[in-house]
């Protein structure tokens, strides 16, 4: 596990949980879009394997659509919050959350009672370590899935976007936190280096909380579809917004729909 991954998702999970919670209000629309794609591909029900599930928003909303969901994440704190939210949404009986590294996916999941119908990887949850590690994770996901399974990679950053709309500095506010982002991007290596600096708000004053240095490989569409093909997945569609099924462009996020080969 990369040092920054451990710090952001394990040691300072309290900060990233607040950031993840900001995405919950848009999750139902995202899952509605996923369901339309699934129906168009002949999948109406079944089981979901949610990779890097965070605090469970995709697993929980898919469970509300009737799917049996299994979420995997390395962060104990994220999974504890996910289990609480599953109870709040009354789907705890059909959602399972497992702690572990997706690079060791088969070991974490074990031998499921049945292979999965759907696999999801949402919100730029790839490129954290190496190409080989991402390939390994998606290969294992394929081995755990049915021949007709559908894979979603959604809300993901890509090189085409950064080549046109790279922003070196920005900030965001959530709860009582202000987060400053300083970014550097190398188009030759597709490596993004970002400083996330967190401040807590005290009236009109800001107090430094922590800093995380993130090193992250950004995929192009062609690079990622090639990786998926090697892992046993064939890309069948791309979108700029999976909730609205807007076509992908260099100015949208990357959303891939792939079918098991």
Set out the residue ranges of the language-model regions:
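Conserved SAM/SAH-binding loop
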Residues: 55
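Class I SAM-dependent methyltransferase SAM/SAH-binding core
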Residues: 60-105
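A short acidic, Gly/Pro-enriched loop at the edge of an enzyme's catalytic core
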Residues: 108-119
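A short glycine-rich, Lys/Arg-flanked "PGG" loop and its adjoining helix->strand segment in the class I
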Residues: 135-147
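SAM-dependent methyltransferase
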Residues: 152-225
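C-terminal lobe and adjacent flexible extensions of AdoMet/dcAdoMet transferase-like proteins
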Residues: 221-261
């Amino acid at each position: 596990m990369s040092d920054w991954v451990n710090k952001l998702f394990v040691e300072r999970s309290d900060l990233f949980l607040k950031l993840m919670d900001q995405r919950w209000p848009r999750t139902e629309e995202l899952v509605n879009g996923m369901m339309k794609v699934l129906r168009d591909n002949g999948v109406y029900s079944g089981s979901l394997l949610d990779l890097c599930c965070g605090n469970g928003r995709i697993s929980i909303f898919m469970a509300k659509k009737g799917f049996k969901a299994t979420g995997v994440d390395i962060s104990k704190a994220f999974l504890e919050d996910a289990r609480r939210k599953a109870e709040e949404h009354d789907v705890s009986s059909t959602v399972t959350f497992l702690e572990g590294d997706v690079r060791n996916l088969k070991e974490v999941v074990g031998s499921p009672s049945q292979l999965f119908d759907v696999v999801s990887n949402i919100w730029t949850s790839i490129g954290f370590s190496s190409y080989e590690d991402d390939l390994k994770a998606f290969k294992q996901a394929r081995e755990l899935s049915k021949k007709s399974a559908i894979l979603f990679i959604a809300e993901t950053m890509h090189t085409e976007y950064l080549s046109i709309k790279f922003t070196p500095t920005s900030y965001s506010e959530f709860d009582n936190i202000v987060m400053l982002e300083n970014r550097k991007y190398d188009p030759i290596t597709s490596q993004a280096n970002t400083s996330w600096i967190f401040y807590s708000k005290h009236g009109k004053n800001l107090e430094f909380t922590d800093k995380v240095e993130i090193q992250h490989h950004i995929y192009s569409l062609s690079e990622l579809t090639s990786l998926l093909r090697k892992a046993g997945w064939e890309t069948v569609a791309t979108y700029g917004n999976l909730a609205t099924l807007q076509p992908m462009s260099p100015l949208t996020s990357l959303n891939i729909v792939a079918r098991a080969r």
